[in-house]
């Protein structure tokens, strides 16, 4: 099939590239000329394992093109996917980019006769596709929905494994205006072997939010367990949660399958972040407030998450006898390993707390080269050893695998004081030199 992707951000470019690799002909459209030029050279504007190779192959084979001409792309395609951003504004998502994209696609539809399906890939609250998007398409095209197709097809891509997630999805959810729209999406995803849900537009929108809210809840639940373990002698959150994970309702017991993926969210740390979970939970709370529905559980999820980085700062200050004038090394800046995304990263919140307490910070992440939110207040040396040089303590804020293989003997010699606060329990089991004070998340004092 011929597919137009409107927006070349994370979702748009991964979706377009992967569809092209599955044999479809894809035109990615973006109004950012610099971004278009970068992608046309085969260079994704963000880090995602496997994407560069797939993109280069699709460009060379002519299965994927990138440009700014939306009308021409829509005129020559069967499906248009809206994959533009929906940033959060005080607990409400900003739909201006979605509405503008739908209006532009609508105008293009008004100039063609053939049936065309518009698919919303952007994460939007329930009721958006059949109101905001539909009305913009109808106004732009001068035609009613049904004359063109309309679907909501949420993405479930995890940064750091998005290509694999797209190619081997655990489910495909399609919300549709009518059966004809659904049939086109069924053809688009032919060959994908996974459960499919064909439902209403609003159910499809809500499935995405409900899924992300559950994951966020698991993280905050684990951090509440960790806080209690830290407050009581003899408790260890990692051991406690390992025992929880082994419940057969969470982990298969057939001897072949490993732990279910969901238990990876049942681990304590410095909190959740990124472009999805915080924004989506807040948007769900905002939608509920508009309808007069109380959300005490989701309110608590966000409150716990906001507190977590501050608690880590407090714990470190207690270990050092204060933070004013201290030099703190922070390892990890992205919100999770395997990505360069620092949006709403707990590591950034942690660093801001350290700076507010009077510490100076030098930070390292294997993929991150700049953190605009920190405004140049933090040194970003090119190697982890340089970040640790002269530090009073090191905080591990992101569980990057390479941190386990550092020469911790040499790192300890380079530090002024030898304190490690492992905010992700990433070094558990790693031999550390004598004389290091190693503090883990969720570990209480020794039992008397």
Protein language model annotation of sequence segments:
Residues 1-448:
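Structural/interface elements that position substrates and couple domains in central-metabolism enzymes
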């Amino acid at each position: 099939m011929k597919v137009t992707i409107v927006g070349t951000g994370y979702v748009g470019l991964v979706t377009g590239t992967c569809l092209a690799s599955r044999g479809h002909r894809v035109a990615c459209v973006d109004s950012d000329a610099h971004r278009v030029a970068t992608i046309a050279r085969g260079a994704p504007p963000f880090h995602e394992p496997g994407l560069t190779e797939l993109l280069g192959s699709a460009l060379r084979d002519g299965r994927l093109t990138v440009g700014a001409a939306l009308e021409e792309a829509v005129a020559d395609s069967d499906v248009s996917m809206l994959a533009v951003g929906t940033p959060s504004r005080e607990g409400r998502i900003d739909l201006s980019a979605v509405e503008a994209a739908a209006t532009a696609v609508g105008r293009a539809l008004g100039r063609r006769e053939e049936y065309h399906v518009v698919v919303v890939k952007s994460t939007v609250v329930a009721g958006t596709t059949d109101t905001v998007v539909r009305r913009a398409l109808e106004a732009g095209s001068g035609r009613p929905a049904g004359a063109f197709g309309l679907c909501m097809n949420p993405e479930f891509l995890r940064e750091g494994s998005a290509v694999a997630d797209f190619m081997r999805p655990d489910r495909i959810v399609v919300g549709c205006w009518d059966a004809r729209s659904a049939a086109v999406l069924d053809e688009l995803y032919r060959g994908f072997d996974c459960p499919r849900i064909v439902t209403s537009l609003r159910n499809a929108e809500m499935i995405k939010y409900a899924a992300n809210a559950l994951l966020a809840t698991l993280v905050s639940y684990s951090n509440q367990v960790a806080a209690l373990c830290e407050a009581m002698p003899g408790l260890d959150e990692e051991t406690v949660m390992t025992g929880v994970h082994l419940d057969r309702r969470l982990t298969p017991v057939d001897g072949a399958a490993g732990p279910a993926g969901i238990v990876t969210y049942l681990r304590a740390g410095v909190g959740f972040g990124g472009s999805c979970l915080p924004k989506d939970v807040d948007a769900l709370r905002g939608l509920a407030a508009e309808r007069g529905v109380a959300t005490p559980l989701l309110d608590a999820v966000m409150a716990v998450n906001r507190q977590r980085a501050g608690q880590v700062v407090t714990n470190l200050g207690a270990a050092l006898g204060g933070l004013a004038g201290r030099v703190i090394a922070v390892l990890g800046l992205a919100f999770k390993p395997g990505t360069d995304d620092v949006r709403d990263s707990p590591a950034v919140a942690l660093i801001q707390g350290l700076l507010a307490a009077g510490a100076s910070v030098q930070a390292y992440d294997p993929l991150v080269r700049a953190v605009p939110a920190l405004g140049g207040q933090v040194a970003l040396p090119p190697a982890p050893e340089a970040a640790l040089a002269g530090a009073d303590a090191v905080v591990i804020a992101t569980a990057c695998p390479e941190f386990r293989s550092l020469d911790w003997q040499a790192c300890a010699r380079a530090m002024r004081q030898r304190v490690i606060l492992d905010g992700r329990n990433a070094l558990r089991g790693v031999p550390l030199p004598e004389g290091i004070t190693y503090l883990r998340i969720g570990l209480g004092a020794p039992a008397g």
